[in-house]
A protein has these predicted regions:
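Conserved beta-strand elements of the Class I
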Residues: 2-4, 84, 170-174
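Phosphate/Mg2+-binding loops and adjacent switch elements
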Residues: 7-140, 146
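Short hydrophobic/aromatic-enriched beta-strand-loop microsegments
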Residues: 65-66, 84-86, 144, 193-200, ...
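C-terminal accessory "lid"/substrate-recognition subdomains
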Residues: 91-226, 279-293
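Short active-site-adjacent structural elements
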Residues: 182, 207-209, 235-240, 255-258
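Phosphate-bearing ligand-interacting subdomains
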Residues: 216, 223-242
């Protein structure tokens, strides 16, 4: 399969760019590089113009399917399945709040175009979430799947070892993701305690050697605490001296309760894929070739 992504923050020399595990974060972007390292059988293609990137990928790789990362509003490319990712914030206090007063790009009516909803939850109780799903999403009649990132251990950035936990020892958390609270909750669930300190950086932050030295100094000040980072940050931090001893949070997706769905997500998606893949792949490739002719 092929993943088409805009590659936020990427600075490739040419487009489209096929991202390999050996690419640099500056060239490929942190998220495409993480995808390339985590999914070795997939082709990760960076191109802000998804139609061009899709045609290029189809011509070279003849994929069974193409996945658009953040493509719900990308109208130049027709889709067969639209999966809309929502958070508890989207369903509760952020419901229907379109930019600039909120994080939504479109109003509630756009949700009718979804094939299914994926709701990303975090550890702990979330008051009002089940009711919001029942009253705000379920009436749309589309399958709804909840999921969470479950921690499964730690790994050294330099590849020297893995651990299930830190045996109760102190740690600090350095993270440059959009929702630091999620990383804090995931780390605390795995390690059984809150971090001594959280060092939040901007999403997609380009870590420097000075940042690494600052993180190490904060850890020393906290009693030689361990340093824990997210996998997204690790692909950038591992390039710098002194970061090899940092721990990366290893996570996996676990699905939870579902609504309007008779089957688990994997089975539901597999059935849809089998219905659509062969026929529509041919249509997509023909349309791309005609457009570029």
């Amino acid at each position: 399969g092929v993943v088409l992504t805009r590659g936020y923050g990427a600075k490739p020399g040419r487009l489209p760019l096929l991202v390999t595990p050996a690419a640099s974060p500056a060239q490929a972007g942190d998220e495409p590089l993480l995808l390339a390292k985590s999914h070795r059988l997939a082709r990760i293609v960076v191109d802000p113009k998804r139609k061009r990137g899709g045609a290029w990928a189809c011509e070279r790789f003849d994929p069974d399917f193409v996945l658009l990362d953040d493509g719900f509003q990308h109208l130049p490319v027709a889709r067969d399945i639209d999966l809309v990712l929502l958070t508890p914030h989207d369903l509760l206090e952020g419901w229907g709040r379109v930019c600039p007063v909120g994080s939504w790009r479109e109003g509630q009516s756009a949700l009718r175009s979804a094939s299914a909803f994926l709701i990303k939850v975090v550890p702990g109780k979330q008051p009002g979430l089940s009711e919001a799903i029942e009253t705000r999403l379920k009436p749309l009649g589309k399958p709804i799947f909840t999921f969470a990132l479950k921690p499964k251990g730690l790994a050294r950035l330099d590849g020297s070892g893995r651990a299930g936990n830190l045996d109760g020892e102190d740690y600090i958390l350095a993270t440059g993701i959009a929702d630091p609270a999620q990383a804090v909750a995931t780390a605390a669930k795995l390690l059984g305690r809150q971090p001594r300190q959280v060092l939040p950086f901007a999403d997609h932050h380009a870590f420097s050697q000075a940042d690494v030295e600052n993180i190490r100094e904060v850890a020393r000040t906290a009693g030689d605490a361990h340093v824990v980072v997210t996998a997204k940050d690790a692909v950038k931090l591992r390039l710098h001296d002194g970061a090899g001893s940092f721990w990366t949070l290893r996570t996996e997706v676990r699905f939870g309760p579902r609504y309007n769905a008779d089957a688990e997500f994997d089975d539901w998606f597999g059935a849809r894929f089998n219905e659509l893949a062969t026929h529509h792949r041919q249509i997509f490739r023909a349309a791309m070739q005609k457009e570029l002719a």
